[in-house]
């Protein structure tokens, strides 16, 4: 009798593990399919044009240092 119970326990445990494995594989397949669907959906939507440049922003001047060479001194 103990052997039958042990075999039944192993059978139920094996079936439970098999069920978990199948459910995990189904979940992985659904995730891949959803990811591909989202990727295709994003490929079909055109990107909006970039915003126009702001004209109110003044660019800082580029620093120019005077040369110390003799030809720039003048008369």
UniProtKB/Swiss-Prot annotation:
Q: Where is this motif: SxS motif essential for MIK2 binding?
A: 67-69
Could you give one GO CC term from the UniProt record? plasma membrane
Induction remark: Accumulates upon infection by generalist herbivores such as Spodoptera littoralis. Induced by wounding. Triggered by salicylic acid (SA).
Molecular function terms in GO for this entry? LRR domain binding; receptor serine/threonine kinase binding
Q: Does the keyword NAD apply?
A: no
Keywords assigned: Apoplast, Cell membrane, Cleavage on pair of basic residues, Membrane, Secreted, Signal
Q: Which residues form the signal peptide?
A: 1-31
Q: What happens when the gene is disrupted?
A: Increased growth and fresh weight.
Example GO biological process:
response to insect
Annotated tissue distribution: Mostly expressed in leaves and seedlings shoots, and, to a lower extent, in roots, stems, siliques, seeds and flowers.
Positions occupied by motif SCOOP motif: 61-75
**What are the start and end residues of every segment in region (Disordered)?**
51-75
The record's principal subcellular location, in a coarse class, is membrane
Name its cellular compartments. Answer: Cell membrane; Secreted, Extracellular space, Apoplast
Q: Per its database record, what is this protein's job?
A: Brassicaceae-specific phytocytokine (plant endogenous peptide released into the apoplast) perceived by MIK2 in a BAK1/SERK3 and SERK4 coreceptors-dependent manner, that modulates various physiological and antimicrobial processes including growth prevention and reactive oxygen species (ROS) response regulation. Inhibits root growth. Prevents general growth and development. Exhibits antibacterial effects against Pseudomonas syringae pv. tomato DC3000, Ralstonia solanacearum, Bacillus subtilis and Agrobacterium tumefaciens, thus being an antimicrobial peptide (AMP).
Q: How does it assemble?
A: Interacts with MIK2 (via extracellular leucine-rich repeat domain); this interaction triggers the formation of complex between MIK2 and the BAK1/SERK3 and SERK4 coreceptors, and subsequent BAK1 activation by phosphorylation.
The record's comment on protein family reads:
Belongs to the serine rich endogenous peptide (SCOOP) phytocytokine family.
Tell me the protein's name: Serine rich endogenous peptide 4
Which organism is this entry from?
A: Arabidopsis thaliana
- Record gene name: PROSCOOP4
């Amino acid at each position: 009798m103990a052997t039958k119970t042990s075999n039944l326990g192993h059978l139920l445990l094996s079936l439970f593990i098999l069920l978990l494995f199948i459910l995990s594989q189904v979940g992985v397949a659904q995730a891949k399919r959803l990811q591909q669907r989202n990727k295709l959906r994003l490929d079909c939507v055109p990107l909006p044009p970039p915003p126009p440049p702001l004209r109110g922003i003044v660019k800082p001047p580029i620093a120019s240092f005077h040369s110390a060479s003799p030809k720039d001194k003048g008369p």
